[in-house]
């Protein structure tokens, strides 16, 4: 096992004595502007308040610094990013496979699954696979896809409808309708 020094991960913001500017534009704890002051004066004010001096915008002239609790600032920032990730809905494409001879009972089960996918906000990919002599009866396949499209017309919008057969299958993609 190799020994070594543990390196602290670099902070995104410089704090307290890490700030290199001579003068800074200072913002108070409540967000009020305190004007342009020397770095030492800003550090003293932060120390009096019992919190940190954090460099918010290092590229500004002079750099903008704020008096705040840095630990609390990082916590709020991570909480906000987690909240944003939670709100993002990753749209998945769910696939259901049909055959030209799919019986009515199986059709109803597959249709129920499609309805569930669309209500959850996911896209649905309907693959119609032909085997053997079924290739000669492509019209039956198109009828199945039309039936699915008509049954789901209130829930979904057709994104792509097959005009010709691709290999031994036809693919139709449905997207959920936007809710008003």
Swiss-Prot record:
Its main location: cytoplasm. The keyword Transferase does not apply. GO terms for molecular function: ribosome binding; translation initiation factor activity. It is found in: Cytoplasm. One of its GO terms (biological process) is ribosome disassembly. InterPro entries: T_IF-3_C_sf, T_IF-3_N_sf, Translation_initiation_fac3_CS, Translation_initiation_fac_3, Translation_initiation_fac_3_C, Translation_initiation_fac_3_N. GO terms for cellular component: cytosol; membrane. Keywords: Cytoplasm, Initiation factor, Protein biosynthesis. Belongs to the IF-3 family. IF-3 binds to the 30S ribosomal subunit and shifts the equilibrium between 70S ribosomes and their 50S and 30S subunits in favor of the free subunits, thus enhancing the availability of 30S subunits on which protein synthesis initiation begins. HAMAP family: IF_3. Monomer. This is Translation initiation factor IF-3. It comes from Pectobacterium carotovorum subsp. carotovorum (strain PC1). The gene is infC.
